[in-house]
Curated annotation (Swiss-Prot):
The glycine cleavage system catalyzes the degradation of glycine. The H protein shuttles the methylamine group of glycine from the P protein to the T protein. This is Glycine cleavage system H protein. Belongs to the GcvH family. The glycine cleavage system is composed of four proteins: P, T, L and H. Gene3D superfamilies: 2.40.50.100. InterPro entries: 2-oxoA_DH_lipoyl-BS, Biotin_lipoyl, GCV_H, GCV_H/Fam206, GCV_H_sub, Single_hybrid_motif. The gene is gcvH.
């Protein structure tokens, strides 16, 4: 079973074994509007939970994407270079940003599950 967790900064993590797929939530892409550019980290970069991991630019603003977990970037979604709109079309599908090899899987416990994230979004409405 695949587990999805969220941050209050609207990043998501989908865990697949010891690797986490990271991107921004549907709520985040709606707030950004049309995404026009995504700056991805280098493969091999070590990121720390809460540290800057990527940048997403939309017609409205440029926003930092923070690492929801600590780990090493083992893959990036190079499709976003030519098709940044995938973030709008399928943020939790084809619009993923990077894959991290987790250095501290216990950090997952600090993230919100889907139900808790939806409750958090309700407080923003």
């Amino acid at each position: 079973m695949t587990s999805v967790r969220y941050t209050k900064d609207h990043e998501y993590v989908r865990v697949e074994g010891d690797v986490a797929v990271v991107g921004i939530s549907d709520y985040a892409q709606q707030q950004l509007g049309d995404v026009v550019f995504v700056e991805l980290p280098e493969i091999g970069k070590v990121v720390t939970k809460g540290g800057e991991a990527a940048v997403v630019e939309s017609v409205k603003a440029a926003s930092e994407v923070y690492a929801p977990l600590s780990g090493e970037v083992v893959e990036v979604n190079s499709e976003l270079e030519g098709a940044p709109g995938l973030v709008n079309e399928a943020p939790e599908g084809k619009g993923w940003f990077m894959k991290l090899k987790l250095s501290n899987p216990a950090e997952l416990d600090e993230l919100l599950n889907e139900h808790a994230y939806k409750d958090f979004l309700d407080t923003l409405a």
